[in-house]
Amino acid sequence: IKMVPASGAASRMFKDLFEFENSDATEPNNAYIEKFFVERENFAFYEALNRVCIAEEGKSIQELVDEKRYKDIVRLLLHKEGLNYGSLPKGLLQFHKYPQYVRTAFVEHLVEGALYTNNRNNEVKIHFTVSPEHIEFFKQHLMSELPRYEDLFKVRYHVTFSIQKPSTDTLAVGLDGVPFRNED
């Protein structure tokens, strides 16, 4: 059985983008933000973000960049009116880009399981530990992707989930470096 801890928040990956969004800056203000916009087409989520920009703002990412509307792009990447990547676990992000498709980290575990952990009956057993607020997203993603990968690899997946215990959560700190805890 392949065991996968999949509750890790992606918010840390976007720390600089959150800081930029909350700053007074109107244009990229550090090397990371500049690189994000210069290299934007290389991100696996680029096409999905571009579709959201067109749907929500009526303009492509390129048009928004041309108009210096950087924060609109960041907002649509990070928040629920767009891709909501600032609130999702890393496993649900479009993370790996291939010539014809993209995969989430979650799907990469399905692929790895098929390649390395299938048994003599071509069954693949994978267990994911997830956060309670994301379990339904993982289950929906699994159901949308499972047929494709069972067919591709000629395997049968047996995927289970459990909830990560709050006692194992990572300590959260604010922008000032001081630990904090929400009431919930």
Annotate each PLM feature.
Residues 1-184:
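Domain-scale recognition of functional cores that engage charged ligands
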